[in-house]
Amino acid sequence: MGSRFFLALFLILLVLGCEVQATQQLQQDDPGSPALLDKVQESISSYWDTAKAAAQDLYQKTYLTSVDEKLRDMYSKSSAAMTTYASIFTDQILTLLKGE
């Protein structure tokens, strides 16, 4: 019975030692991760800001009032058409659900 006790005690200590070692390794890995994540976020943010600034600059250089007016007109007509079709679709769905 003494050897079983020592074997069980040895296994418990081995498991506890492995958990303590794993906890220490996780604590050592954690400080590096946020720094890497911050670097990646800053890099993506700077690329996005650069692309946005380039797109705005290109838009300002190629701004044409006639094209802008056509786009605004096209947007207003298409949004009016979508509103009409959405209301027709809604009426059809309500008619199907009511069963009239």
From Swiss-Prot:
Span list, region Lipoprotein lipase cofactor: 78-100
Gene Ontology terms: cellular component: chylomicron; high-density lipoprotein particle; low-density lipoprotein particle; very-low-density lipoprotein particle
Intracellular or extracellular location(s): Secreted
Keywords assigned: Chylomicron, HDL, LDL, Lipid degradation, Lipid metabolism, Lipid transport, Secreted, Signal, Transport, VLDL
Pfam families per record: Apo-CII
GO biological process: lipid catabolic process; lipid transport; positive regulation of phospholipid catabolic process
Region named Lipid binding: 66-74
One MF annotation (Gene Ontology) recorded for this entry: phospholipase binding
PTM section of the record: Proapolipoprotein C-II is synthesized as a sialic acid containing glycoprotein which is subsequently desialylated prior to its proteolytic processing.
The keyword Transport belongs to this UniProt entry's keyword annotation: yes
Leader peptide range in chain numbering: 1-22
Main location class: secreted
Similarity comment: Belongs to the apolipoprotein C2 family.
Function summary: Component of chylomicrons, very low-density lipoproteins (VLDL), low-density lipoproteins (LDL), and high-density lipoproteins (HDL) in plasma. Plays an important role in lipoprotein metabolism as an activator of lipoprotein lipase.
UniProt protein name: Apolipoprotein C-II
Species for this entry: Microtus agrestis (Short-tailed field vole)
